[in-house]
Structures are given as structure tokens and as C-alpha cells.
């Protein structure tokens, strides 16, 4: 089946207890990126990472704290040309009726409208509309 997504969509990251995030599709990015602050490694050999996120783009006072196993560390060059080392985690993403495990880099996106961008690796199997947003419904909480 072909699944359609718009240039912006509601997604959920259930393994991180994030039921609804406004995200922008970005075919210029290979890997998805998630806004994170207070990023800290922990555990034996620092194999885990914990971080905070403000999932509501209009309310920075509301924070959710998450943790995940570190999949990788990558040097990522953002659209403004600045390179930074980022932790990569793997977690389940839900868009509409589609659930899939995707890699996500953690970075500070506090000045960005979208707390998450959905990169090409997560968009495999989707048709993207550059003209429409919200093909999928708001996630069921």
C-alpha cells in the first residue's frame, strides 16, 4: 500500500511517551532529528542517554523527560552549514496507521517551529505532498 504524508504531520513516539508531536517532513535530511535539551549519557559505559523535550511548540514550560539506548554518534551538518556531534537513538514512530522503528538524532531545536523533522530514512514507503499538510489525523491519546 501507498501511504501519503504532507509537508507537516502529527507523529507520536510511543516508546518515549510522546503521544503527539508536530513534525515537518524534510527530504534534505537523511536522518530524523528531535529537539532535546539537558542531554546526558548514563549507565555502564555511557550506553544510555536521557534528555528533555518540550513537545508543545507553543508552551516551553511543559517538559517531558525521556531516556533511550544510544545507537550511534554522528557528525551532522545542519542546513545552516554548522556541524555538530549528535547522539542517535532508535525508537518507534507512528504516523497515522503506520508504525516503524527509525533512527533519530538529538539536537537543540528550541528556536525552530518544529520540534521534530522526519528525514528520508523514516519516509521510505511514503508519498510526500509538498502542497498539503496533515494527511493523517491527530494521534489518539
Report residues per predicted region.
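Pepsin/retropepsin-fold aspartyl endopeptidases
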Residues: 1-141
